[in-house]
Amino acid sequence: KRAHALFLFLETDPIGCLHSNVDYDVPGVDDKSTFEMSSGNYTGNRVGIKGSEDLGNGMTVGFVLENGFDSDDGSFDSNEDLFGREALLYVEGDFGKVGFGRMGILNSTAGSFAIGNFTPWGTGWGAVGDQSLIFGANIGSRWDNMISYRSPEFAGVQIHAQYSFGANTTGDEVEGKTTTDRYYALGATYKNGGLNLIGIVDSINEKHAAGTEDPDDTLRVTIGGSYDFGVVKPYLSAAYFKDARMKSWMDSYNTEGKTGTLDQLKGDWDGYGVIIGASAPLVGGTAHMTIGYMDAEAQKDYVATFDPNGADLTRYTFAIGYEYPLSKRTKVYADAGYFKDEMDYNSKDWIDRDPEGYQAAVGLVHFF
């Protein structure tokens, strides 16, 4: 009886998405390529439950629990956590919305507080739509022990804020201490008719062990927007990053060394990136396109294993895609993307590395 009474006041709904695709990938190194069935290219597979309860006086408490998995083999995604995509408890009222738990960062499209719709792809569509390849600062899309806030809307403007205490206390890492990375972000959005503007500043307070030098903290500033004209929706966005962790296309900079796999993009990078794109209705579906450019410079303390004098990196990306709805909850899609890097080491002892790669995929997505 108690359980029955609880569900009279607590509205709950199952949530989920099942997605499979076939893709052809050329990472851009050693002429290797793969042709395989995979999942999560368009968007991540998930299953979960969400619910809310009206507390009266304009107050609501709710939760979201989402498990991520790979549909091609049934294995856990998101570091094999049970609710690795999102584990959120929130309170909402006239003051706005406050959430606690594991959730996506502002500068992504993952979860209840994300606002990172800077391109037609968001942060989905695999490597083709991965805006962090251009925006630098390879910050994880989801963090544990997060507090998030979203303000009420004032004349189309909303303020967003986040802080993560870092990973749970395990081994040498202690939550909320300097031994674990901590994340924070501040953002603002503006909506007026077809106009959508976004600005986000986010950073990682880098961890360091006792008695070691405090590393420079990662900083990223991202601005962008779109305008829906009906016949076409153009996008324009740009990011500045400092002391950032660079991201590579499909691990194209990983090199086998004497001590294992080495990442030639490891280190602190300063630079900027720009993405232009558009979406447009086409034959009952929607077509998307983006072009990206990034220019970055590694610090002189880069990774001594490779080049202590630093390095310069220029990156170009191009992507197209098309999605077609079969129903309100099911769609098919196809996409293709290309990237090219121009890496110049500042030491004559190293050979410049200029990977060039491709990705193409077709898939089926069903939401429930």
Q: What role is predicted for each listed range?
A:
Residues 355-368:
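Outer-membrane beta-barrel "beta-signal"
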Residues 12-22, 65-67, 102, 161-163, ...:
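Transmembrane beta-barrel strands of outer-membrane/channel proteins
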Residues 185-319:
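Detector for outer-membrane/organellar transmembrane beta-barrel domains
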Residues 48-50, 88-92, 148-150, 187-189, ...:
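Outer-membrane beta-barrel architecture
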